[in-house]
Amino acid sequence: MIVVSNTGPLIGLAKLNQFELLRRLASAVYIPPQVHRELLAKSGPEAAAIDNALHEFIQIKIPGAVDSATTDILKGLDEGEKQAILLARSFSSPVLLLLDDRAGRTAARKLNQPLTGLPGLLLKAKDVGLIKDVLPMIEDVRAKGYWLSDAVVDAVKVAAAKR
C-alpha cells in the first residue's frame, strides 16, 4: 500500500520509535514539502528518528493541481494538511492518507479519500502480527505528549478487543 502522511502521525511514530512499522506496512511513503518542513523543524528526543526516516524511506513529492471544489473543502486547514490531502489525491493508484487532525479527516472524507491515523496504523500493525498489543503504545504516545482524544482511545480499545 502507498501511504501519504501528514506531520502528526509521523511525529507519533517517532515518539514511539516505531517507524519500522510504517516501513513494513507501506510499499512507499510520501510526504508533501510543507510536511517535510514541519518535520525538519521538530526538535526533542524524536528528531533523530524523524531524520533517519526522512533519509531512509520517506519520499518528498509535490502535490498535483487542485480544482475549486476541492479548494473550498480544504479551506481552513493548515498548509501541511492541505498538501497531504492533495498529494494523496494526485496518485492514480489507491493511496492511504495518514492524518489525525479532526478537521483534516473531515475534509478528506468529503473527498472520499481513504485514511487512517496513528491509532489505525497501530491496529493494522497488530492485525498483521507486527505488534502484540496496541493499547500500551497508545498510552505511551499520549504520555509523551501526542494528543489523542479520550473518544479515540476508547474506540481503539473496542477495536483492539475485537481483533
Language-model segments: residues:
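Active-site-proximal, substrate-binding regions of enzyme catalytic domains
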Residues: 1-96, 102, 111-113, 136, ...
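Active-site-adjacent loops and short helices of periplasmic peptidoglycan-processing enzymes
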Residues: 105
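Conserved, well-ordered active-site substructure
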Residues: 116
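Helix-rich interaction surfaces within compact, conserved domain-sized segments
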Residues: 138-140
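Short, flexible loop segments at boundaries between secondary-structure elements
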Residues: 125-131
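Glycine-rich phosphate-binding active-site loops on the catalytic face of alpha/beta enzymes
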Residues: 120-121
